[in-house]
Structures are given as structure tokens and as C-alpha cells.
Amino acid sequence: MSIPDTEIPVDDDGYDENGYDRPSKSQVKREMHALLDLGKQLIELSPERLRQLPLEERLYEAIRTAQRTTGREGRRRQIHFVGKLMRAAPADDIRRQLDVWENGSREETAAMHRLEGLRERLIADDEALTELLSRYPGADVQHLRAVIRAARKEAQQNAALLQGQEPQRKQYRALFQALKSLTQ
């Protein structure tokens, strides 16, 4: 049986190389502070978002109470209570979901970038439409051509604008939405 690199080697008596049988106080404090910080992040969330997380009812109610508490000392005590309840919560799952909400999933972001690049190619070149139609043979060709034509016309009009004038983006967005609905 191999020992993972992240664990401290333990001998037959159950002690690590430093002679301790449990994590150090400093390590425990770091973990508790991390849970407290996670609890503070949860307190800042809306009730709708909180309901989407895998929280026990007691923790959910403690977070809602902290959100309603206005007094400084009472709020501080409630935050620490939330931190204490966080010890039993699935912190990794919660962090993962918060990361998705804050940054979006990488797959979604990559898909959006691909669609934006395709939109630029469609506006610039007719060959891109042929490529697109070969990938999606069931696409509404007439609608796509109309949206592309309108986006090209809009791009030409935007190129002729004077400095300080606001460019139009309606057809540009419509083309993106058409591509998005096509790929879903």
C-alpha cells in the first residue's frame, strides 16, 4: 500500500514522524478559520442561492439568522456559530458550487468563446457558413443567412460611425443567440 504524498508518514504506533498522533493546533486553527471564511461567504448569498447548496436545515437557519442580525456583537457571535456548524457541512461541495457561481464553469466559458469566434468568422467570411452547415445539417439556412447579412450590414454601419457615437449591436447579438440555440 502506497502512502499519498499529502499525508505525513505514520509509523506502526499511529504517530507521525514528529511524534504526534493528531494534527497540530495551528493546522486545526487554519482549518477552522477557512470554514469561518466560507461561512461568511455563505452569509452574503441570497436565500435562493442558499437553498441550492447541500446545507443541513440547522446550518441554513443559522445563516439566515446571521443575515437578519444587525447588531455588531450579535452578528459576530452568529458568524462564529455558523463557522462551528460548518465543521459538519460538506465544505468541498459548497466551495465547488461557489466557484461555479463566481467564475462560471470552464466548459461554459470555453463554449461561449467558441461561439464568439464562430460569429466573427461568419461575419467576415461566407466559407464559415458552409462549414457550419456541414456540422449542423438541420439548421435553418434561410434564417442564418438573414441574420448574418443583417450583422454584416450593422458592422459596416458601425465602421462608418463618427467618434463618440454609440455602435449598434442588435444584429451582432441576434447572430450569437442564433448560434447558441443551434448548438444546444
Swiss-Prot record:
<comment type="similarity">
    <text>Belongs to the DarP family.</text>
</comment>
<dbReference type="InterPro" id="IPR006839">
    <property type="entry name" value="DarP"/>
</dbReference>
<dbReference type="GO" id="GO:1902626">
    <property type="term" value="P:assembly of large subunit precursor of preribosome"/>
</dbReference>
<dbReference type="GO" id="GO:0019843">
    <property type="term" value="F:rRNA binding"/>
</dbReference>
<keyword id="KW-0963">Cytoplasm</keyword>
<dbReference type="GO" id="GO:0043022">
    <property type="term" value="F:ribosome binding"/>
</dbReference>
<keyword id="KW-0690">Ribosome biogenesis</keyword>
<dbReference type="InterPro" id="IPR023153">
    <property type="entry name" value="DarP_sf"/>
</dbReference>
<feature type="compositionally biased region" description="Acidic residues">
    <location>
        <begin position="8"/>
        <end position="18"/>
    </location>
</feature>
<protein>
    <recommendedName>
        <fullName>Dual-action ribosomal maturation protein DarP</fullName>
    </recommendedName>
</protein>
<dbReference type="Pfam" id="PF04751">
    <property type="entry name" value="DarP"/>
</dbReference>
<feature type="region of interest" description="Disordered">
    <location>
        <begin position="1"/>
        <end position="27"/>
    </location>
</feature>
<keyword id="KW-0699">rRNA-binding</keyword>
<keyword id="KW-0694">RNA-binding</keyword>
<dbReference type="GO" id="GO:0005829">
    <property type="term" value="C:cytosol"/>
</dbReference>
<comment type="function">
    <text>Member of a network of 50S ribosomal subunit biogenesis factors which assembles along the 30S-50S interface, preventing incorrect 23S rRNA structures from forming. Promotes peptidyl transferase center (PTC) maturation.</text>
</comment>
